[in-house]
């Protein structure tokens, strides 16, 4: 039976650490860290995600600044809102909640965020820093995966890693982080032919393709570490990921569950990025080096 990569439990442990470290740093900084989440429109799923992030902030002592614009907000109105948050000294991290309503172009909006306040690690400058191996905010989901692997003593160095999916949100930064950890990395995607022959080479397999249960037992070699980034609602109810957990549990060495795997760690790494930005701004030295990816 596969080792359970329990992101929910790890996230809870890390929240306690973050809370303790924030309390140590408040005297030097003069205030708590601040995270601003900018939400456009009334997408129900986005509203739930934002509430979860606000609750996580409250648990660890990060001040949360919610900002909400209507679905018909113009590109210029969103740019103005971002610029106001850039100038707000209370704010250390800014997150633009995706996806955006139709008619808005996310690329220039993400580029408008102050790179030093980029809580999601998606600014072009920070993606470039990742590519060059320089310090900076990291994309939250792949960073969460790396911390999960580290927590279980799973070292990617020298291993064959396969990432299924090439999005700028997960797949591409995931591949770069694994490569930086000295894995030999292959990226597969929707145009990849003979996917099984590629995924079966993996000692570490990260699936972020956005297709429900697309990876089954035939796709892996026994003993593979499998990280499932996908999350989907089944027509009959309940949630599933991009892998068929029932098939993989008997053959994988380790497997992240859905829900309770990568999702909670994504939120935690958003908090980590915000707290680290707060530390840099106020020259606060905290014991968080093991959370830097």
UniProtKB/Swiss-Prot annotation:
NADP(+) binds at residues 165-167, 190, 231. Keywords: Amino-acid biosynthesis, Histidine biosynthesis, Hydrolase, Methionine biosynthesis, Multifunctional enzyme, NADP, One-carbon metabolism, Oxidoreductase, Purine biosynthesis. The gene is folD. One of its GO terms (molecular function) is methylenetetrahydrofolate dehydrogenase (NADP+) activity. Gene3D superfamilies: Leucine Dehydrogenase, chain A, domain 1 (3.40.50.10860), NAD(P)-binding Rossmann-like Domain (3.40.50.720). Homodimer. GO terms for cellular component: cytosol. Signal peptide: none annotated. This is Bifunctional protein FolD. Catalyzes the oxidation of 5,10-methylenetetrahydrofolate to 5,10-methenyltetrahydrofolate and then the hydrolysis of 5,10-methenyltetrahydrofolate to 10-formyltetrahydrofolate.
